[in-house]
Amino acid sequence: MPTAAPIIGIVRHSINVDGEGVCTLVAFHSCTLKCKYCLNPHSLSGVEKYKKITPEALLERVKVDDLYFQATNGGITFGGGEPMLRAEFIEEFKRICPSNWRISIETALNVEQSFVRRMFNVIDHYYIDIKDINNTIYESYTGKSNQQVIENLKFL
């Protein structure tokens, strides 16, 4: 069983913004990038504003919206930070949540491909923030190369 994961926020009742239908966004702490325009700077290392939650505790918290998820083809969208870093947590959550919930992920894809391969059969829908295809621009925004992103896009 996975340990609890650091979560910086849970936003319920997002409609057609963080996924199809009614969705709940679950944002994880930690990221592989340091984007100059980061939407969630409190998700970065060094900023310890999070609560550790188990997959079971998350399910207890969000299952109140099961009817909304079923009626709208909605579900849970994992974001962050970089949710691919929490593959074990997401796998366990998918295993225990209702099978008709849609599991989506908002990712920059700048992670080792082993994470992407692990999540391939877990995630129903990907929202990929590519930042920029030009590596020079990408590096100036994020502090890292986009080569891993390109390799992961080819895999998907």
Where are these regions (language model features)?
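Conserved AdoMet/S-adenosylmethionine-binding subsite of the radical SAM
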Residues: K63-L67, T72-G75, G79-L156
